[in-house]
């Protein structure tokens, strides 16, 4: 089962965005679109989401479910 992390980090926090993207790459998450990443480990994504929220960004984690 996969999970999707979507997030938004304010432009003035570009260094934080770089750090988040690097963290996601290191955990082998797959970039679907800018600020939309897919990964199978929910707890890893939750850690990243908390980091994003702690710097003033917004983050959501969705469970991927293929319907058709």
Segments from the language model and where they lie:
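Short glycine-/aliphatic-rich beta-strand segments at the starts of folded cytosolic domains
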Residues: 1-9
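Short acidic, Gly/Ser-rich segments with clustered Asp/Glu that frequently serve as metal-coordination loops
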Residues: 12
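Short amphipathic alpha-helical segment that frequently serves as the phosphate-/nucleotide-binding helix
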Residues: 21
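Short glycine-aromatic motifs
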Residues: 24-29
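Short, intrinsically disordered low-complexity segments
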Residues: 30-68
